[in-house]
Amino acid sequence: LVVTAHPDDETVFSVTMFKITHELKGVVDMAVMTDGGGGFADAQLGAVYYGLPLTDSIIARTHLPMIRKQEILNAGKVMGVRNIYFMEQPDDLYSTNYEPYLYGKNWDISYIEKRLDKLLAEREYDFIITMSPRTGQHGHHITSVIMGLRAVERYKGSKKPIIIAGASKMNGNADPVLTGIPGIDISKINTNVPPFRLNRAYRFAENDKLSYKIVADWTIAEYKSQGAIQENAMHRTDEELYFYYDINPLNGTEKVKKLFEDLSKSGFLPAPKK
């Protein structure tokens, strides 16, 4: 289960999701917190494409929720997602203050918790993937992370899922460093466990023409209302990194290690060196 805040957040994990479903023949679902109605700041070209003045906040909040649902359904088809569960919380504004969401002023937290609890109980997921737990980011992102962590903490079944946090490494950049959100103990990353890695950038096929970055580009391309991600993320991420939360049992690392070893061996492999 991939837990995110907005349609398009999952593009950080898109190649992992694609390889799990298409190559390992696994199952991936998503839980998306907001309706996406606030994502209109970079919709200038999308407004032309959709024939609506989407940079107008009133019009955007009327039409963007449906538009972005369709966009994520299209992206989900690329990634092989089985089901997308929409939590329908308001995408009200950009703020790094997570408290109005986490403490239930702006979001219906009890509704989210009940739905996540039901999903985890019925679906018995092996893994939960969240966004990065770090300060200075969107309050919606932080709250979605905590919702996923608390759902795992509440889980009473015999098959508790392992929960990991995903991040992207852009071309030429240093590895992201994640430790958790200060003041929120449940978000602590086990820094003794190195991040698990998925390489999008290695080349394969005739004359090394292709890479799995193409899959990520396919998913990003579905978000025509979101100009910034298309301008800034297309073909720029070399690796997906996944960090191990401290709330997991230490022996669960072997399960995650096996997943990423299996992913590294699946699908198209690098051409042998000559």
PLM feature segments, named:
Residues 1-123, 149-150:
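Active-site rim/loop-helix segments in enzyme catalytic domains that contact anionic ligands
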Residues 1-3, 99-105, 109-274:
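Metal-dependent de-N-acetylase/amidase catalytic core
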